[in-house]
Amino acid sequence: MQAWTKPDIPVVPGPARRLRLYDTASGGLVEVPPGPDGPARMYVCGITPYDATHMGHAATYVTFDLVNRLWRDAGYTVHYTQNITDVDDPLLERATATGVEWTDLAEREIQLFRDDMTALRVIPPQEYVGVVESIPLVVERIAELQQAGAVYDVDGDLYFAVKADPAFGGISSYDADTMRTLFGERGGDPDREGKRDPLDCLVWQQERPGEPAWDSPFGRGRPGWHIECSAIALQYLGMTIDVQGGGSDLIFPHHEMSASEAQCATGQHPFARAYVHQAMVGLDGEKMSKSKGNLVLVSRERQAGSDPMAIRLALLAHHYRTDWFWTDSELLDAQERLDVWRGAITRGTGPDGPAAVDALRAALTNDLDTTAALAAIDQWAETNGDDPEASALVALAVDALLGIKL
């Protein structure tokens, strides 16, 4: 599937720094990649294409865009893959409710997402892969799990046995009750009769009336959610990728289960060196989500005349691991900051440029500390100086590292 237009990414002079990120599994900062050799490999879970792109989505993809940019700044070749869950229960339900073909709904929302990512200057993945086009890959992975004895049948549906992976639970570190609760809230079926374990997850669902289905050795049907990402990531990136990324609501069950499926299918461990998660963005005291309908959409803000760089800057004003709530003042504050930065760039001279760039790099490579990074540029912009090359250098660094075009 086609991704979107790649922005220009300038090269910033001066010494780069190695990136450290918070790994959910270990509960601490890890350096990724762990050595000087590349490529740096990253998989980020993509959207289910309906109601794209809300600010929670945008925050996630801007966060991992920073990872991409910092790796490039450090000299790594980056191999980045992102999926699109272009067949799933919520998509089918929305299509039915609105009287639209599910394929048409998916196509429309995917294009809207592409347009938003282009406007926000997010670097596209090398592989932008839909689930529908990946059905053969999913079938292969399920067959591997069968050979490993990790799949069983319940009335024609196939389930992954989580106990087949001794490492299951190691990403989230949640207790059994929490896992069961979250599994039920996030698409799972812990109470289904015939399952060996309440947490066992669906990998192949037999054909249902009125729903899309594909031929397979297991009968006609469609894949479960978690195996889709396992299959796509293994195909394009292999095992022990550097970063598995997504929103914090994916820690369990999605990332836990997709990692276990990959580990059982290959017999290798771990699936990823770092599991990195963007915190939730809410509105009016609640999580922003499609199911709640309390969405602030990037496309609507753009149509209303908001500068996409102000939208991006508003997202960067919050550390990626801190939950926060969108308000109208977020965008107003970001536009004001953007105006100050742009004004500082046009003055011709400024404070020491290399020092500002080094402060920017130091903040961002320390677990994407965007609040400190923005403060460093604020300080530079609000201070007078006589370095004739500072403005051009800072503008270059803000473009390359923060993705903000001044």
UniProtKB/Swiss-Prot annotation:
Placement of sequence motif 'HIGH' region: 47-57
Cofactor annotation remark: Binds 1 zinc ion per subunit.
EC numbers for this chain: 6.3.1.13
GO molecular function: ATP binding; cysteine-glucosaminylinositol ligase activity; cysteine-tRNA ligase activity; zinc ion binding
UniProt binding sites for L-cysteinyl-5'-AMP: C45, G46, I47, T48, T60, N83, I84, T85, W225, G247, S248, D249, V281
CDD domains (UniProt xref): CysRS_core
Motif 'KMSKS' region positions after renumbering to this chain: 287-291
Cited NCBIfam families: mycothiol_MshC (TIGR03447)
Protein name per its UniProtKB record: L-cysteine:1D-myo-inositol 2-amino-2-deoxy-alpha-D-glucopyranoside ligase
Organism: Kribbella flavida (strain DSM 17836 / JCM 10339 / NBRC 14399)
